[in-house]
């Protein structure tokens, strides 16, 4: 039996669509994430100037939504992982979690093609943690998580296979 403080859990699931420009495409991406999650997405802004693409700092170029708690687990298990057939590359795993891309939103179960939206893909990133990680985020008496308590790539891969039924390719 595993110690309760060593139990791995989902901190958050972040869904991101990088459009690369503001305007109609950005509004479509915003609407897609709103329909998929039932939450209000936030627009992400450019940090650097890219002259060739007509991007300047502060210009909205993408949308993202962060899911936490039971809702994050439910959407990951019922919608996002079935869209990629529960298969994720080993190189997609890090010490903090794992990420994967969904080429077109119509691959997600329950999502129908909408001619107004067109075909849009999105990225999902799952951030994992153990109980006790709050010591790094709190404001008072902030501290570091010890190296033995910190997650590593092998533990995350094992957890994803057992808990979520993910196949590593």
Swiss-Prot record:
Keywords attached to this entry: Ribonucleoprotein, Ribosomal protein, RNA-binding, rRNA-binding, tRNA-binding
Listed Pfam families: Ribosomal_L5, Ribosomal_L5_C
Recorded superkingdom: Archaea
Record's keyword annotation contains Disulfide bond: no
Matches recorded under InterPro entries: Ribosomal_uL5 (IPR002132), Ribosomal_uL5_arc (IPR022804), Ribosomal_uL5_C (IPR031309), Ribosomal_uL5_dom_sf (IPR022803), Ribosomal_uL5_N (IPR031310)
GO molecular function terms noted in the UniProt entry: rRNA binding; structural constituent of ribosome; tRNA binding
A biological-process GO annotation: translation
CC annotations in GO: ribonucleoprotein complex; ribosome
Family: Belongs to the universal ribosomal protein uL5 family.
Subunit structure, interactors included: Part of the 50S ribosomal subunit; contacts the 5S rRNA and probably tRNA. Forms a bridge to the 30S subunit in the 70S ribosome.
Known role: This is one of the proteins that bind and probably mediate the attachment of the 5S RNA into the large ribosomal subunit, where it forms part of the central protuberance. In the 70S ribosome it contacts protein S13 of the 30S subunit (bridge B1b), connecting the 2 subunits; this bridge is implicated in subunit movement. May contact the P site tRNA; the 5S rRNA and some of its associated proteins might help stabilize positioning of ribosome-bound tRNAs.
PANTHER family: 60S RIBOSOMAL PROTEIN L11-RELATED (PTHR11994)
Protein name: Large ribosomal subunit protein uL5
Source species of the chain: Nanoarchaeum equitans (strain Kin4-M)
Gene assigned in the entry: rpl5
